[in-house]
Design a protein with these regions (language model features):
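Alpha-helical transmembrane bundles and membrane-interface segments of multipass inner-membrane proteins
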Residues: 1-224
Length: 224
């Protein structure tokens, strides 16, 4: 796979992710919902300070550590992608790594810059604006990640009483609210796990080289 194809894949994901985030941030009130397909596929504007899928991580210091970790991971990802492209890894594996990288970069952009360029979004506040006169709602590396995709396929249903521990309680499936970057990371990881044998299968010339090497070793042992 050529580098320019890799760059196009990454750019496409980041543009889609950031475009939707900016639209939601500036066009929807915090907590507002828009039904896209029935009641099970919605836009639901929230922000989170933590990891993917709304998981939180240790307050302000945790937020800073998480953002720095993301930055290091993205820098490492640049070199790793160059390496697997130059070594001609399986096309599917390269695409999955690009998806994971683009997702990490998409959320990193939020964490690094959104606090600087947007006004605060919260319950009862007006729509957020870009580059507000008084400055953004947070400093560098302390921005909140914008989430908006919610797919409650089963919402607020009561579990049968015979189910241990949770019987009789109400639940929603699928409850996390996420964004395109989160989805890109998750799909990339899942596809790698499902198709790892295909992605890392030895090529015919590598298998032939292994057979020849083993044969040479056996001949040497017999001579000795």
């Amino acid at each position: 796979m050529k580098i320019r194809v890799v760059v196009l894949i990454i750019l496409a994901i980041i543009i889609a992710d950031q475009g939707l985030k900016i639209w939601v941030k500036t066009s929807m009130y915090y907590g507002e919902q828009i039904n896209l397909i029935g009641n099970w596929f919605r836009l639901f504007f929230i922000e989170n300070e933590g990891m993917a899928w709304g998981w939180k991580f240790g307050g302000e210091w945790g937020k800073l550590i998480l953002t720095i970790f993301r930055l290091i991971a993205v820098i490492f990802g640049v070199f790793y992608i160059r390496s697997i492209v130059s070594k001609n890894y399986h096309r599917g594996f390269i695409i999955c790594v690009c998806m994971i990288f683009a997702g990490a970069l998409g959320n990193l952009i939020d964490s690094m810059f959104y606090g600087l360029i947007f006004s605060r979004s919260d319950d009862g506040l007006p729509l957020a604006t870009m580059f507000p006169p008084g400055g953004g709602y947070a400093g560098f590396l302390h921005g909140k990640v914008v989430d908006m995709i919610w797919m409650p396929i089963i919402e607020n249903k009561t579990l049968p009483t015979w189910i241990p521990f949770w019987g009789g309680e109400r639940f929603t499936f699928f409850s996390p609210i996420f964004n395109i970057a989160d989805a890109s990371i998750s799909v990339g990881v899942i596809v790698i796990l499902l198709f790892q044998r295909r992605f890392f299968k030895k090529k015919p010339h590598e298998e032939h080289a292994t057979i020849e090497t083993n044969s040479q070793v056996n001949d040497t042992v017999q001579v000795l």
